[in-house]
């Protein structure tokens, strides 16, 4: 063992990080029809034009909170991969228990 801890085999020497593309405006990937479909599933019949940007903003804040908590669980476990259970625990912490993904 080369003293790299667990998972240290075959991963190279762990040199400099590669430049990662900065992600911007990905929230626009949540399209108007996608928001409309979610609203239809929730029983909405008619949708105001102002709803779409508002929905994107709310969804962004919600996902940021869940992902922050999930990554915190992952880092505490000294892992590099966020698992489904990390997300389940993050949602449970926020009072939104999710069933069907283990645990």
From Swiss-Prot:
Role noted for this protein: Core component of nucleosome. Nucleosomes wrap and compact DNA into chromatin, limiting DNA accessibility to the cellular machineries which require DNA as a template. Histones thereby play a central role in transcription regulation, DNA repair, DNA replication and chromosomal stability. DNA accessibility is regulated via a complex set of post-translational modifications of histones, also called histone code, and nucleosome remodeling.
Keyword terms: Acetylation, Chromosome, DNA-binding, Methylation, Nucleosome core, Nucleus
Sequence positions bearing N6-acetyllysine: 17
Protein's name in the database: Histone H4
Residues modified to N-acetylserine: 2
Disulphide linkage map: none
GO molecular function, one term: protein heterodimerization activity
InterPro entries from the UniProt entry: Histone-fold (IPR009072), Histone_H4 (IPR001951), Histone_H4_CS (IPR019809)
Assembly behavior: The nucleosome is a histone octamer containing two molecules each of H2A, H2B, H3 and H4 assembled in one H3-H4 heterotetramer and two H2A-H2B heterodimers. The octamer wraps approximately 147 bp of DNA.
Species in which this protein is naturally found: Aplysia californica
Sites of N6-acetyl-N6-methyllysine modification: 6, 13
Region described as Disordered: spans on this chain: 1-20
One Gene Ontology term, aspect cellular component: nucleus
Family annotation (PANTHER family): HISTONE H4 (PTHR10484)
Biased composition range(s): Gly residues: 1-14
DNA-binding region: 17-21
Gene of this entry: His.H4
Subcellular locations according to the entry: Nucleus; Chromosome
Listed PROSITE patterns: HISTONE_H4 (PS00047)
Residues bearing the modification N6-methyllysine: 21
Assigned protein family: Belongs to the histone H4 family.
């Amino acid at each position: 063992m080369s003293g790299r801890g667990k998972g240290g085999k075959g991963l190279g020497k762990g040199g400099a990080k590669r430049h990662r593309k900065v992600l911007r405006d990905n929230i626009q990937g949540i399209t108007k029809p996608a928001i409309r479909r979610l609203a239809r599933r929730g029983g909405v019949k008619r949708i105001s034009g102002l709803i779409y940007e508002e929905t994107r903003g709310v969804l962004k804040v919600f996902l940021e909170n869940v992902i922050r908590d999930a990554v915190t669980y992952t880092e505490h476990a000294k892992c590099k991969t966020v698992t489904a259970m990390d997300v389940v625990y993050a949602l449970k912490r926020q009072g939104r228990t999710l069933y069907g993904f283990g645990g």
